[in-house]
């Protein structure tokens, strides 16, 4: 029940009278024609309502959250604590650079940390989400070709195992998407790549490790072929958590990338924001980076604006990015340091391989059994579907009943009835074993009573929602009747 429905028409809480202001200068079409619909609740009732809702939330602070490709790692409280210091929290966006030197120094150091981590030479922290960073990266590729007069380069190559945002970003930037297949071993089909490379190629968008959870072994060959064709390589940083300190996109031949700080650098995840998706580039694309950036002149830190970067693709938003998120990322990086970030990647990889081996041991089917998991892996429940009629969705709903968030379902699309599982480095063996035992228990139930799975979840206030109705009849301005 939403708060509007609880006591409407029953209670009329008193409010302090307010003096009516002059509204004569407000256009008539901007004035309300009727009173707003507001919940009628006392303060205590409101507190109880939202406290009860919070207890129904599922989050990384309450339970294991192995959502593949999302890197649901713990957000350290120290980062929140120090990012909430008055000097950071109370800084006004219009404050002069001279008055916020401490904040700018943190951002400057974060830019340098990202350069070192990725093997790139230029960084902008301006994008306010991973998707916006992705847009900025492809926009820079387009700007690069246009400056060279290569206006015919309007094709972006995207593997079929790519993130769904990749083709969407290319489309938003006015480019055509050319899809190529992934082979049965998880690597890109090089022969298919050769067939689509040509004078219209603007670039290729890759995630490495890929969304099927394996490292692209032919990345050096791919980079050479794309560059020889005149294209550029875009690195989707969604899976960067798997390789920190072990491999760098710049060294693989990538020209531009975006990072998801809510994944790699453990900033708050989900809830609609705020987010941060920094972009990093090599020398080819530095002149196109979005502004503002933080620079250093003499011993002072400064904002670099359009006048300092004349070929920039421009601003992506008002002000200077989501600095509260960026500060949290800086603190996370400072706490771990280079060795700590490398260790985090090692443990993330170890955890993924442990879970993959254990589930294989328990008789589940691994999508790419001959490959090592980089940080996540895929279980296909196709045998369970064929033998018992239960689906990946049924397993997912039953997992929620057992206090474990479901892994990513049906993604990537090329693996049938799949669960994409990513434990991250912040989980211990007990948490992972709880998940494994839950999977075994659910399969045992499926053998005896598959209809039980069809009715799950049983322990939540909402059970199976009508996904089609929600998509077809979207209501984002709901009001009580």
Curated annotation (Swiss-Prot):
InterPro entries reported in the protein's UniProt record: GcvPB, GDC-P_C, GDC-P_N, GDC_P, PyrdxlP-dep_Trfase, PyrdxlP-dep_Trfase_major, PyrdxlP-dep_Trfase_small
Class in the EC hierarchy, top level: oxidoreductase
Coiled-coil annotated spans: none
Record-stated family: Belongs to the GcvP family. C-terminal subunit subfamily.
GO biological process: glycine decarboxylation via glycine cleavage system
Any one GO cellular component localisation term in the record: cytosol
The keyword Oxidoreductase is annotated on this UniProt entry: yes
Record organism: Francisella philomiragia subsp. philomiragia (strain ATCC 25017 / CCUG 19701 / FSC 153 / O#319-036)
Catalytic activity annotation: N(6)-[(R)-lipoyl]-L-lysyl-[glycine-cleavage complex H protein] + glycine + H(+) = N(6)-[(R)-S(8)-aminomethyldihydrolipoyl]-L-lysyl-[glycine-cleavage complex H protein] + CO2
Keyword Oxidoreductase: yes
Assembly behavior: The glycine cleavage system is composed of four proteins: P, T, L and H. In this organism, the P 'protein' is a heterodimer of two subunits.
Role noted for this protein: The glycine cleavage system catalyzes the degradation of glycine. The P protein binds the alpha-amino group of glycine through its pyridoxal phosphate cofactor; CO(2) is released and the remaining methylamine moiety is then transferred to the lipoamide cofactor of the H protein.
Molecular function per GO: glycine binding; glycine dehydrogenase (decarboxylating) activity; pyridoxal phosphate binding
Keywords: Oxidoreductase, Pyridoxal phosphate
Record's protein name: Probable glycine dehydrogenase (decarboxylating) subunit 2
Region (Disordered) residue spans: 1-23
Record-listed N6-(pyridoxal phosphate)lysine modification sites: 263
Cofactor names: pyridoxal 5'-phosphate
Top-rank taxon: Bacteria
EC number assigned by the record: 1.4.4.2
């Amino acid at each position: 029940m939403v708060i509007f429905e609880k006591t409407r028409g029953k209670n009329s809480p008193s409010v302090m009278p307010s003096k009516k202001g002059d509204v004569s200068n407000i256009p008539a079409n901007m004035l309300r024609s009727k009173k707003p619909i507001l919940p009628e609740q006392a303060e205590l009732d409101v507190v109880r309502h939202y406290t009860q809702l919070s207890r129904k939330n599922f989050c990384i602070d309450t339970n294991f959250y192995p959502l593949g490709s999302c890197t649901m790692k713990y957000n350290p409280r120290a980062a929140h604590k120090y990012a909430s210091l008055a000097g950071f929290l109370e800084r006004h966006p219009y404050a002069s650079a001279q008055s916020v030197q401490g904040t700018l120094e943190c951002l400057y150091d974060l830019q340098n940390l990202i350069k070192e981590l990725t093997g790139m030479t230029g960084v902008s922290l301006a994008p306010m989400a991973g998707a916006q960073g992705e847009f900025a990266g492809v926009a820079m590729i387009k700007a690069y070709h246009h400056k060279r007069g290569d206006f015919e380069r309007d094709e972006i190559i995207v593997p079929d195992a790519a993130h769904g945002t990749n083709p969407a970003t290319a489309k938003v930037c006015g480019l055509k998407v050319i899809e190529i297949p992934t082979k049965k071993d998880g690597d890109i089909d090089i022969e298919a790549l050769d067939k689509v490379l040509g004078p219209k190629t603007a670039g290729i968008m890759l995630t490495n490790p890929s969304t099927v959870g394996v490292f692209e072994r032919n990345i050096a060959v791919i980079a050479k072929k794309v560059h020889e064709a005149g294209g550029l390589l875009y690195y989707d940083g969604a899976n960067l958590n798997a390789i920190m300190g072990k491999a760098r996109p710049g060294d693989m031949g990538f020209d531009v990338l975006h990072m998801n700080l809510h994944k790699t650098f453990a900033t708050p995840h989900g809830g609609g924001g705020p987010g941060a998706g920094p972009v990093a580039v090599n020398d080819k694309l530095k002149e196109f980076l979005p502004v503002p950036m933080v620079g250093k002149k003499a011993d002072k830190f400064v904002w670099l604006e359009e006048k300092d970067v004349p070929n920039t693709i421009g601003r992506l938003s008002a002000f200077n990015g989501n600095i509260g998120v960026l500060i949290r990322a800086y603190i996370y990086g400072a706490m771990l340091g280079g060795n700590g970030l490398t260790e985090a990647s090692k443990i993330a990889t170890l955890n993924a391989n442990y879970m993959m081996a254990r589930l294989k041991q328990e008789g589940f089917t691994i999508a790419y059994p001959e490959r090592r998991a980089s940080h996540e892996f895929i279980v296909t429940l196709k045998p369970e579907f064929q033998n018992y009629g239960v689906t990946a969705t049924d397993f997912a709903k039953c997992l929620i009943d057992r206090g474990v968030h479901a892994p990513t379902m049906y993604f990537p699309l090329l693996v049938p009835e799949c669960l994409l599982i990513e434990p991250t480095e912040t989980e211990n063996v007990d948490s992972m074993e709880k998940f494994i035992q839950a999977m075994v228990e659910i399969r045992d139930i499926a053998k005896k009573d598959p209809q039980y799975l069809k009715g799950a979840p049983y322990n939540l206030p909402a059970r199976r929602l009508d996904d089609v109705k929600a998509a077809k009849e979207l209501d984002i301005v709901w009001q009580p009747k």
